[in-house]
Design a protein with these regions (language model features):
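Nucleotidyltransferase catalytic core that binds NTPs
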Residues: 1-145
Length: 145
């Protein structure tokens, strides 16, 4: 059975901690799908703009570790609807040889993420604690010179 690991984030900017997150997530499965949070979501979060969503998506799409990268369609701070759409693609293809997983970095646990409910409803397994928090995009932006 093919395992597809889904991860998400703002990646604004992308840093070494994100690469480690991708590396550890990819080790759990056969393919890595990265959901890039949109500019709308970044504004909701209140973080500084550094790169727009298209630039972030392009960079993530061109990383060797990443098999698929997509822009979040959600209109809140979650990626619940995007996860639902990814799941629907595999249901429509009737690909029963695929198992989906949603993975979180070391600073997140499955007990606190808003995506937990949709993942459980759709039968998507949860993985958490993928490494320690190595860097912070917010810290990098706040300390840029």
């Amino acid at each position: 059975m093919k395992k597809i690991i889904i991860v998400s984030g703002y990646f604004n900017p992308l840093h070494v901690g994100h690469i480690e997150y991708f590396r550890k997530a990819k080790a759990y499965g056969d393919k890595l799908c990265v959901i890039v949070n949109s500019d709308f979501q970044r504004a909701l979060k209140g973080s500084k703009p550094f790169m727009n969503e298209e630039e972030r998506l392009c960079i993530i799409n061109n990383l060797r570790l990443v098999d698929y990268a997509i822009l979040s369609v959600d209109t809140d701070g979650t990626v619940c609807e995007t996860i639902r759409e990814i799941n629907s693609l595999y249901v429509l293809m009737e690909d029963e040889g695929v198992r989906l997983f949603f993975a979180n970095g070391g600073d997140q646990t499955n007990d606190i993420i808003p995506e937990r409910e949709i993942c459980e409803k759709l039968g998507i397994k949860l993985i958490d604690g993928l490494g320690e928090k190595i860097q912070s995009s917010s810290w990098l932006l706040d300390n840029e010179k």
